[in-house]
């Protein structure tokens, strides 16, 4: 059983954390993140160390304990280093471009797919088959990357589609003729 909820979070220099009721705010060199945590989980701040504790040992509280600690740790890492995901477009004629606040994907449909850029996610298109996404919020970054990938997820026969940079696609053999 995981005991991640009991691990302490060491705050790097330049990072401030505060709690106002159930809202935790983390400020760092790259920005500020806020998140509401469960009132059943107690957070204590001792200088540069953050600890989490729970009142009871029910299964729900055990899950919330580890999840809350992981979410706050992701906030601390995000305001210090940030997060980045790279997507590759594989296929003949597949390309991406950025026009203003819209990501335009040409991925084999009759019309290009337009996606609005979220506020806290930065999009960079260094070449027309690569999309670089970066953000301080790991959750929003992962959700947007999954939305982009879902536009044309990789198929198992030729591997065409939008995939993460280091993603391995399990390939299938086609039918054999008689």
Curated annotation (Swiss-Prot):
Molecular function per GO: rRNA binding; structural constituent of ribosome
Key words of the record: Ribonucleoprotein, Ribosomal protein, RNA-binding, rRNA-binding
Origin superkingdom: Bacteria
Disulfide bonds: none
GO biological process, one term: cytoplasmic translation
Database matches in InterPro entries: Ribosomal_uL6-like, Ribosomal_uL6-like_a/b-dom_sf, Ribosomal_uL6_a/b-dom, Ribosomal_uL6_bac-type, Ribosomal_uL6_CS
GO CC terms of this entry: cytosolic large ribosomal subunit
Task of the protein: This protein binds to the 23S rRNA, and is important in its secondary structure. It is located near the subunit interface in the base of the L7/L12 stalk, and near the tRNA binding site of the peptidyltransferase center.
Entry-linked PANTHER family: 60S/50S RIBOSOMAL PROTEIN L6/L9 (PTHR11655), LARGE RIBOSOMAL SUBUNIT PROTEIN UL6M (PTHR11655:SF14)
Subunit structure: Part of the 50S ribosomal subunit.
Family, as annotated: Belongs to the universal ribosomal protein uL6 family.
Protein name per the record: Large ribosomal subunit protein uL6
């Amino acid at each position: 059983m995981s005991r991640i909820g009991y691990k302490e979070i060491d705050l790097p220099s330049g990072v401030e954390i505060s709690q106002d009721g159930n809202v935790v705010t983390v400020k760092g060199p790259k920005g500020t993140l806020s998140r509401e945590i469960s009132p059943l989980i107690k957070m204590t701040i001792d200088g540069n160390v953050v600890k989490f504790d729970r009142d009871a040992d029910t299964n729900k509280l055990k899950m919330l304990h580890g999840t809350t600690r992981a979410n706050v740790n992701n906030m601390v890492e995000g305001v210090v280093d940030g997060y980045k995901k790279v997507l590759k477009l594989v296929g003949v004629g597949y390309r991406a471009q950025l026009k203003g606040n819209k990501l335009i994907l040409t991925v084999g449909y009759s019309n290009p797919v337009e996606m609005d850029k979220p506020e806290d996610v930065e999009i960079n298109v260094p070449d027309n088959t690569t999309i670089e996404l970066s953000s301080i919020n790991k959750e929003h970054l992962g959700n947007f990357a999954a939305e982009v990938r879902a536009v044309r997820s990789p198929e198992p026969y030729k591997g065409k589609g939008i995939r993460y940079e280091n993603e391995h696609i399990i390939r299938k053999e086609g039918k054999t003729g008689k």
